[in-house]
UniProtKB/Swiss-Prot annotation:
Biological or metabolic pathway of the protein: Cofactor biosynthesis; coenzyme F420 biosynthesis
Name of the protein in question: 2-phospho-L-lactate guanylyltransferase
Listed GO biological process terms: F420-0 metabolic process
Keywords from the named record: GTP-binding, Nucleotide-binding, Nucleotidyltransferase, Transferase
Catalytic activity from the UniProt record: (2S)-2-phospholactate + GTP + H(+) = (2S)-lactyl-2-diphospho-5'-guanosine + diphosphate
InterPro entries in UniProt: CofC, Nucleotide-diphossugar_trans
Signal peptide residues on this chain, from the entry's feature table: none
Protein family (similarity comment): Belongs to the CofC family.
Organism: Methanocella paludicola (strain DSM 17711 / JCM 13418 / NBRC 101707 / SANAE)
Amino acid sequence: MKAVVPFKTVNAKSRLSAVLTADERTKLARLMLDDITGVLREAGLKVVLLTTAPFKYDAEIVVSEKDLNSALNDFLSSASEPVMIIMADIPLITVKNVRDMLASPADVVISPGRGGGTNVQFIKEPQKYHVDYYGASFLDHMRIAGDSGLTAEVFDSFNASSDIDEAQDLVELHIHGKGRAAEYLRTFMALDVSKGRVKVMRDVQKVPEGRHPGRSVATQ
């Protein structure tokens, strides 16, 4: 079985630009990808990267200039076996999480992201299904499964729902991460527990002067 991982090769994780430099965002995105592909392979899946530009990586690469939904739906329409679609920014996901999804009796297993999104889908009959990401895609995918006559299971998991999009999301990676992305983040970012909600802040004792995009203060 294959796991398709959409991966943005240019200007990755731009919403983290307030706290991370372009080089840091690029490296973090690559390490999150490494963590996720490692988990997928350990769970017995063959990794396929879906990108908009050629990219050197130890995996099958599918390059498409189409939008995300069109590119994924092209892949699903030609698939002859079950397919997992997993986003490249959920580095907390574990082998057990993936195996639990694969073991579900449902036709489609959907793991929601925060804010109504969809982080992972496991589709047993891909030619009967299509995806519709962006917006409240979790609700859209549940509807699509029903309209297609497919049973759907919601996979409720903190690990799978923790996507790293905003600065505040880095807190979860810093606290709970066990992979290379978390190790990298901890080399220059620390937790700010001084007041209210926990935040991340740049650790000036670990970062050479001039490397960071702003002052060493907690993220907003």
